[in-house]
C-alpha cells in the first residue's frame, strides 16, 4: 500500500483504457475495499453492481449526454446505487464509497473515472437514472448515484500539481483568516 498523499497525487481520472480484462481477484479486492467504506451510523445504504459484459458496458456508455462514452472502453463498470430509506445522507455515503473505489483502483495500478448519473439526462432528454435503472433491473426504491469505470490505463497523466493547491480556501478559526 502506498502512502495516502502519494495516492492522492497520482490518482487521476482515466478516460482511456487498454482492452485488457481485470482478474476476478482484483475485482474482489476492489469490492473488499469499497465494502469497508464508512457511512453515517454504519447504515451502509450503498450497493454495487459490477458490469463486465461488453454489450451492457456499451449501453451504459449512452446513459447521459456527455462524459460517459469512456464506459464502453472500460474493463468493468461499478454502478453505485443506494437505498435512501437507510440513511438521509445516502448521497454522501455513496460518494465516500465511490472515492474509496477510486483510491483502491489506483493502489492496484488500475485507472478509474467517475460518471455522474443522478440529476443527469441522456442526449434525448431522458432521465439518466431511469435509463440505468431499466438496463440493470434496479428496483424503483433504490437510487443510482454514479458509475465508476475501471480498467487498465491506456494513458499516462502527470501527478497532481501541488503548486495549484488553493490554500486561500483554508480558513483558520474563522472565515477569512488564513495562513
Regions found by a protein language model. Name each.
Residues 1-179:
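Acidic, surface-exposed loops and disordered segments
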